């Protein structure tokens, strides 16, 4: 009886020792294989020219630093281009293969198939509030509208620059602008903005805080308003809240990887009057407005010149944003 129990225990112990030996052998073998594999990769990696995918970055159109390709210097072979256009263009062209056609044409300019993306938008006002700019280079086509020239220039200011915005509760609080880069941005179907500057005793300067009819009107019945008032002075604000919203925004700097192409119009819109736009320059292209196919053909022809004055996936407070017209 006892002999059987001892034999069973001995068998279990031998099995455990044998299993432990097998596991150690497998571990040592795997370590040897992995070490050899990593050594081989380390030895041949300097001789292989491939895209470095070691860093994943969610691209929103604006980063604080430039991330360049570490293994290849060809700008177009390792870059992506997004072309944003109004939905009316696709409706006018009415061709299911038009994007493929344009991709083939971009290929003749050095952009590989699959590196150019086409994205439509229905409303430029909505698009400009929070533009989703996914590519290394982003080109926005904006149709000129002579009924909203001021709105268009302010839309361009929103798209070409990075803004940090917060909602405002004008029914409870007074607000002041702290610097030239601090603006109040109102947007809606009908924005009428009135302001009343206040002294240190919170009494109106040239207006009565209890009577909005005495407030200064800075914008009337507009879709987009970028309001600039005297810095360091509290203001009581009144807007048409049913048709308009207002936000307190700070301009962080230009989106260097974004360009706007103005489609049509007798004159190019000027967004450089704002002292926060540095340097005071704009770059302009011109062709006569005809049809959307003509517009896209021109974009293909000049795309490389446009790209050369942009910066890949970057934003710098010391560099210019760029505005084009065709």
Curated annotation (Swiss-Prot):
**Please, which domain of life does this record's source organism belong to?**
Viruses
Which keywords annotate this record? Calcium, Capsid protein, Disulfide bond, Glycoprotein, Host endoplasmic reticulum, Host-virus interaction, Metal-binding, Outer capsid protein, Signal, T=13 icosahedral capsid protein, Virion
Per the UniProt entry, the signal peptide is: 1-50
Any one Gene Ontology cellular component term annotated for this protein: viral outer capsid
What molecular function does GO assign, one term?
Answer: metal ion binding
Q: Region CNP motif: start and end of each range?
A: 165-167
Where located? Virion; Host endoplasmic reticulum lumen
- The set of disulfide-linked cysteines is 82-135, 165-249, 191-244, 196-207
Glycan attachment sites: 69, 146, 238
Q: Name the residues that bind Ca(2+) 2.
A: 177, 228-229, 301
Q: How is it modified after translation?
A: Intramolecular disulfide bonds. N-glycosylated.
Q: Which Pfam families match?
A: VP7
For region GPR motif, the annotated ranges are: 253-255
- Residues that bind Ca(2+) 1: 95, 206, 214, 216
UniProt family annotation:
Belongs to the rotavirus VP7 family.
Q: Which HAMAP family match?
A: Rota_VP7, Rota_VP7_A
**Self-association and partners:** Homotrimer; disulfide-linked. 2 Ca(2+) ions bound at each subunit interface in the trimer hold the trimer together. Interacts with the intermediate capsid protein VP6. Interacts with the outer capsid protein VP5*.
The misc remark on file is: Some rotavirus strains are neuraminidase-sensitive and require sialic acid to attach to the cell surface. Some rotavirus strains are integrin-dependent. Some rotavirus strains depend on ganglioside for their entry into the host cell. Hsp70 also seems to be involved in the entry of some strains.
Function recorded in the entry: Calcium-binding protein that interacts with rotavirus cell receptors once the initial attachment by VP4 has been achieved. Rotavirus attachment and entry into the host cell probably involves multiple sequential contacts between the outer capsid proteins VP4 and VP7, and the cell receptors. Following entry into the host cell, low intracellular or intravesicular Ca(2+) concentration probably causes the calcium-stabilized VP7 trimers to dissociate from the virion. This step is probably necessary for the membrane-disrupting entry step and the release of VP4, which is locked onto the virion by VP7.
Protein name, per record: Outer capsid glycoprotein VP7
């Amino acid at each position: 009886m006892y002999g059987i129990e001892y034999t069973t225990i001995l068998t279990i112990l031998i099995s455990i020792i044998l299993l432990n030996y097998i596991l150690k052998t497998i571990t040592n073998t795997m370590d040897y294989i992995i070490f050899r594999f990593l050594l081989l990769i380390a030895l041949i990696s300097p001789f292989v020219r491939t895209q470095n995918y070691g860093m994943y970055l969610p691209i929103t159109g604006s980063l604080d630093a430039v991330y360049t390709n570490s293994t290849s210097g060809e700008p177009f072979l390792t870059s992506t281009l997004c072309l944003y256009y109004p939905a009316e263009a696709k409706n006018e062209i009415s061709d299911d293969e038009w994007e493929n056609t344009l991709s083939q044409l971009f290929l003749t300019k050095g952009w590989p198939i699959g590196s150019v993306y086409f994205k439509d938008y229905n409303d430029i006002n909505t698009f400009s509030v929070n533009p989703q700019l996914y590519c290394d280079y982003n080109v926005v086509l904006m149709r000129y509208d002579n009924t909203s020239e001021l709105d268009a220039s302010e839309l361009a200011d929103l798209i070409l620059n990075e803004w940090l915005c917060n909602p405002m509760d004008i029914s409870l609080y007074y607000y002041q602008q702290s610097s030239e880069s601090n603006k109040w941005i109102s947007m809606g179907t009908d924005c009428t903005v009135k302001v009343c500057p206040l002294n240190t005793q919170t009494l109106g300067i040239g207006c009565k805080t209890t009577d909005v009819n005495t407030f200064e009107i800075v914008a009337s019945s507009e879709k987009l308003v970028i309001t600039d008032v005297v810095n360091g002075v509290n203001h009581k604000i009144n807007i048409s809240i049913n048709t308009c919203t207002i936000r307190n925004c700070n301009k962080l700097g230009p989106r260097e990887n974004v360009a706007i192409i103005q489609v049509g119009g007798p004159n190019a819109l000027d967004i450089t009057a704002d002292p926060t736009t540095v340097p005071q320059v704009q770059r302009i292209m011109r062709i006569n407005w005809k049809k959307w196919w003509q517009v896209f053909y021109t974009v293909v022809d000049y795309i490389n010149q446009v790209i050369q004055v942009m910066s890949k996936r970057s934003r710098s407070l010391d560099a210019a944003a760029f505005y084009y017209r065709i």
